[in-house]
Amino acid sequence: MNPKLRSILFWIHLICGLIVGLVVGVMSFTGAAIAFESQIIEWADRDARHVTPPAEGAPKLTLEEMLAKVKEAKPAVPPSGVTVYPGAESVVSVALGRGATVYVNPYTGEVREPGAQGWRSFFHTMEDLHRWLAASGDNRAVGKAITGVANLAFLFLGLTGLFLWWPRKWNLRAMRPILWFRRGLKGKARDFNWHNVIGFWSLPVLVVLTTSGAVISYKWASNLVFTLTGNEPPAAQGPMAAAPVVVPTPAPGTQPQPLDAQFAAVMKQSNAWETITLRLATPPGAGAPGGRPEGAPRGEGGQRGEGAQRGEVGPRGEGGPRGEGRAEGRGGPKGPQASAFTVREQERWPLFANNTVSLDPFTAQTLKTETYADFNSGRKVRTWLRFLHTGEALGWVGQLIAALASFGAVFLVYTGYALSWRRFVPRRKTQAVAPPAPVAPPAETNINAA
């Protein structure tokens, strides 16, 4: 590389890193902290989600009865979603508003609070820091803007860092110090070695994380995915591009089918399933205050989706990875709304894929079934980017890789600041004062008189 160009890139890289380094460090640390949120919550919630049937083949309450129990126990916030599981020893999960969940014993109607409140509070704090630096109210938009710009700057730092890393000579002696850790180094040499090695090995993952983060943060980036794949961008930010499902107008006085009948119709046409979720109509403004938007994935403030519910229409862990679609009634702007169910099957690919089944609520007849295969190419790529951002697209292995790369980014911030400090604030070298040279005693003069 031309030395002059290299010098220009170096100073741009350094100044940009100094400006956004702290924000990048916070985002990287919190990203690593919430990497395995779903598995930890599932483990901590294991007792709260388990029930003992009173007898083999004991009848369950109807879903309407369970919802009535929830409304009685939680009158302030209306139910917004219901998730059922196939096991006889499983609870029914009921979402409240936009950020809370309770479990219902299907045999007794007992309403339980989720366990792991400490873990939930911790992850909620980490996500708020990750997405908008824990800002609240009107300042949340400012925090989100700062993290969005810092994410783009981090992508730029990664690319310029690769140019600066590029060895002048491609031989083992020149490349070894920038490809692997060296023992016995201290101070500037150690930080330089760490910065180069960690940056090189984590760069591919960090490019994916920052690129996908930009697509999540910015509508123009999300639209670009659809444009590059030759598809019309959806009106709303995110991958949701399905048209409303039209429900035939029923005869006057016709009542909707019971929820159990609607769930049974969906179960009948589904393969071995893990969860089935129905989002209920919620009055405007009924969301739980302060709750994370229903299904809003990390870094994305929109709907959750194609897949499951991270914000707990179904508790994470039962529903699998955070999704981007919504299980909710959908129809035309006027007229009856379709009952839209999100089905997570056991045998699925990609791992985040869900099926959406839209029913006529008055007849329980299927109006439309949409699977991942039905998505256009833009929506497929957009959804992959959403789950690559958390690593969930590749299961726990992907989550581990994303966590390690995020943790590596924390060290990049540390070593970057340490190298900058040594550059701008050099250590004062104390010069040892040489002891004064010993003074020779005066020579004796002997005068011998003759």
Task: Give, region by region, the residue ranges found by the protein language model.
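Conserved histidines in hydrophobic membrane contexts and catalytic metal-binding motifs
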Residues: 1-450
